[in-house]
Amino acid sequence: MLRTIVTKIFGSRNDRILRRLNKQVRIINKLEAEFELLTDEELKSKTTEFRTRLKNGEKLENLIPEAFATVREASKRILGMRPFDVQLIGGMVLNNRCIAEMRTGEGKTLTATLPCYLNALTGKGVHVVTVNDYLARRDAETNRPLFEFLGMTVGINVPGLSPEEKRAAYAADITYATNSELGFDYLRDNLAHSAQDRFQKHLHYALVDEVDSILIDEARTPLIISGPAEDSSELYMAMDKLIPILIQQDKEDTEEYQGDGDFTLDLKNKQAHLTERGQEKIEQWLMEKGFINENESLYSPARISLLHHIYAALRAHKLFERDVDYIVKNGEIVIVDEHTGRTMAGRRWSDGLHQAIEAKEGVQIQGENQTVASITYQNYFRLYEKLAGMTGTADTEAFEFQQIYGLETIVIPTNKPMIRDDRTDIMFENEKYKFDAIIEDIKDCVARNQPVLVGTISIEKSELLSNALNKAGIKHNVLNAKFHAQEAEIIANAGYPSAVTIATNMAGRGTDIVLGGNWKAEVAKLDDPTEEQIEEIKAAWQIRHDTVKQAGGLHIIGTERHESRRIDNQLRGRSGRQGDPGSSRFYLSLDDALMRIYLTEGKLNFMRKMFTEKGEGMESKMLAKVIAQAQAKVEAHNFDGRKNLLEFDDVANDQRHAIYEQRNALLDNEDIADTIQVIRQDVFNHVIDEYVPPHSLEEQWDIPALETRLKQDFALDLPLSKWLEEDNTFNEDVLRERVLTVAISEYKRKEELVGQETMRNFEKGVMLQTLDELWKEHLSAMDHLRRGIHLRGYAQKDPKQEYKKESFQMFTDMLDTLKLSVITTLSRVQIRTQDEVEKAEQARQKIAERENAAMQYQNNEGTSSLHEKSEHKIGRNESCPCGSGKKYKHCHGSKAKY
């Protein structure tokens, strides 16, 4: 109450920031008349002038008025569009490391040109991030003429580019890219084996379009580069046959309640849990099928893999639905993004879930993969020096943006007042009554020439509604993951009078629905249109536009509330753009997922009693409050999940950062001999410590074991026992010094044989290969640790602290293993002289001749006997002619046929 009173008097923080930025807008507006008088060449030269001033020490912020005035004037001349004052404010907000909430149709694409140009002046690169490659290409091509006029280069980074094209994209002043491609390029750069194979420059400034979709909705989706793992497709098919015999029970067993089912479902977290009865039933089934022995437990360490497959199959059957969570296309399982309704080609669920769904649907089961490199969007975008974002719906997630990314959300006012009529939600007893009411609403709109956009939350629901509309004889278009290819055309026609469009989670996000239809799309269909044709199309559009405006603009129908208010607002935001009329209404039922999952049975029963007549709808303030509470619960739950993920991933992120930093230093450094020398000294001291404890008595030394270890691991045959007997001054320090001296001497001998350059390259190659292999194994071990760490809570231990402690120990162990493996490999490598190589080649040729003769013998005995007489056969125990010193049977003779 007090806070509201104070805000009314002094204004909110958002209001105060807008007032401050308006002062800058007035300065920019004063410059407009001056910049209009500049010639094109004078306007272009401003870029060089600004860059020179920056090099001379002027701050970037001081250039804002002139730089923005330059972009505004260039935009007027090149694009035929003048950025509004609110767009100038949006540009300044984006430059200030903030998120700009700009309503649909307010020109976010044009707004982005202002901070992009300003930050590109630094020469450090600007990345404009979009949710898909269509938007990346569209925005880049739209703004390219403007930036190139001002002397800036523009690049597009999307999947499928060649290395040269990708390198050129990153070299540009401003690069338009998809979020996933940027993340994967970062991972690929940190798997590169030469500095020239890396693409990304310094991560300076990222401007993220649809920032809520990328940094909130996809925050829990890790980007993973993986390699093949052990195949277990038969096991997935076997476990798939188990699921039909299992019975679900509504809630978990407690002291007061004992159900009769085999498993329970956690719909909020999409997890399944076995009951004791379920475990016993499964164990019996596994014994009958021969998967486990009698009296063997499902939870024994040797059978954990079986349990993993069972849970994957259970989740696949009971928690993931076809045409809701995924579709089957060309014999493959394709994930459907729950937030956008788009298919996510190439993406696969982890933890065996994807394979379990493939088994469920009877398609080919693709092999499991092992993680080679991974990062979340949360941690990737926090690598940028400067991060900003824009969207039409950010204010509801402002707290999370601030907490996780340190980004403040500023709501930008609309250029024209918004006049959309957002009507009260209507609740129905069940889905049938709800759909009946929706059909009636659509009929009314169609009769009045009003276009309708109907939003559904899944492909399944969109097809149910489509069938109902077909029965009612209403023409309509369906936009979901199955009809993704027709998206642009469907959206272009969605604003026509009486047009009815069904969209899954507003999959057409990023494209405006124009009242009366998109006349530019009509022109684009014509080959070389004349001015007369264009004018005819525009005139026809104007009539349709006026008709739709008179009918009330675009009408939005939501078929149920989403878990997040933000997704609902995105749907509503398709209507009422740039001061256009419009309306919206959500139709709900007690069968909706939000109601079933997040409202108690008591509340649902109470609400059912409020319906006195069949098919009646109910709207009230209490209903709005109940829905708001349910959505708040979900948002809080999802935020906790993302925050929890980040806290765990931050541990891995610190380790990832340390490894990648060292790896890049390796790539950039031509000579790592000094590093190898430091590691060698550390490794030998550590090995000697195992057999000769520091400051210990001679009786405690295990010299024979140390001799064996040095010979096996480092190819050093040293007479340590003899040194100890013959030298009275031989002590621990002398031992360490002599061993290291001999090791270095032997290594230098090898280096002299091959040359310094070859040895330096070999050292780097061994270091990189060993590091990559151990890091891959470490990621797998961390993943296993993370999956089971929550069980520590039962022992009254904090799982997060335990994870931090154990993962740190695993990391230090990995580094110790890295050092030992590198020095062991370098010490044991055998160097051959040119003479030895030539002898080996001669021996190889002789062996090949004998093998050919043996093959001829099988076809023609006579010629074979002549050959055998003319050539001496090398005995298996004779020295190999290659000069290696080994017996023939242990060298090239191992490949010969006898």
Swiss-Prot record:
Its cofactor is Zn(2+). Residues 886-898 have a biased composition (Basic residues). Zn(2+) binds at residues 880, 882, 891-892. Keywords: ATP-binding, Cell inner membrane, Cell membrane, Cytoplasm, Membrane, Metal-binding, Nucleotide-binding, Protein transport, Translocase, Translocation, Transport, Zinc. It comes from the Bacteria. It is a peripheral membrane protein. It catalyses: ATP + H2O + cellular proteinSide 1 = ADP + phosphate + cellular proteinSide 2. GO terms for biological process: intracellular protein transmembrane transport; protein import; protein targeting; protein transport by the Sec complex. This is Protein translocase subunit SecA.
